[in-house]
Each structure stands twice: as C-alpha cells, then as structure tokens.
Amino acid sequence: MQCNINDIIKILPHSYPFLLVDRVIECDPGMSIKAIKNVTFNEQFFIGHFPGHPIMPGVLIIESLAQASAICVLGKKTVENKVVYFMSIENAKFRKPVTPGDTLILQSNFEGLRLGVYKFKCVASVGKEEVAGATILAKLQDK
C-alpha cells in the first residue's frame, strides 16, 4: 500500500503544522510501514530551534514515527470514531541531527499486541544513516 498526502489526511486526525508524514512508500497494514517526512526550512519549529543552526527537535522525529505507526495500524481504511493514541516511548535514541533539506525515512515494524496496545520498533533515517529510533506503544480507541 502506498499513500500520498491526500490519503494521509484522511487517515490521521492531524493537520498542519502537526502532520509529520508526507508520503507512505510501502505499508503492509498492521505489520510494517516505510514513510517519508520531507524536512524543509519552512517548518515552524525551526524559528526557535535553533536560530542560525536549525535542527529538527527529537520529540518531533519520534512524533513522526508515531504517526507512521498509526497509519500502519489503520491502513488505508477510515475507521469511524477511532483514533490511535500514542502511549509511551521506550529506548529512544538520537544519533544525528536532522536539518532542513533532509528526507526523513520513517520505518516502523509491528512487534506485538497485548491488551489492545500495539508495540512498534521504529527507526528514522536520513539516507542509509540511522538518526533516531525508539519502541513506541499505541492504542486504538474511541474518539
């Protein structure tokens, strides 16, 4: 499954400036996803993080991974009155700064489901270099 921004807007409840996935390259719904976030100098967070030395905040890289994971849970179908809530982060690591002009590759792989909580192993890369990673827990719930 592939998705463009118009599909993503229908799947996720997020909107500008907090929609942090631009395209889905491949997705096996419920199992894995590979998506892209194009990082541009026009991002609002670069105004203050950091003036003269723009770096994408690590928490937003993790949020990008969580949004990609939510798309993986939902697939391309619209789930009425449901939303995927980000519940926790485990073992977050930040290895290299992400700067304007980078294409952030978001990879999320399903690791398990327990008591309705999805567990994903996530990695963010620029090119072939890993820039961040974490285990993300999320739950599909009523809105």
Swiss-Prot record:
Its EC number is 4.2.1.59. The active site is at H49. GO terms for molecular function: (3R)-hydroxyacyl-[acyl-carrier-protein] dehydratase activity. It is an enzyme of class 4 (lyase). HAMAP family: FabZ. Belongs to the thioester dehydratase family. FabZ subfamily. Involved in unsaturated fatty acids biosynthesis. Catalyzes the dehydration of short chain beta-hydroxyacyl-ACPs and long chain saturated and unsaturated beta-hydroxyacyl-ACPs. This is 3-hydroxyacyl-[acyl-carrier-protein] dehydratase FabZ. The lineage of its organism: Bacteria, Pseudomonadati, Pseudomonadota, Alphaproteobacteria, Rickettsiales. The gene is fabZ.
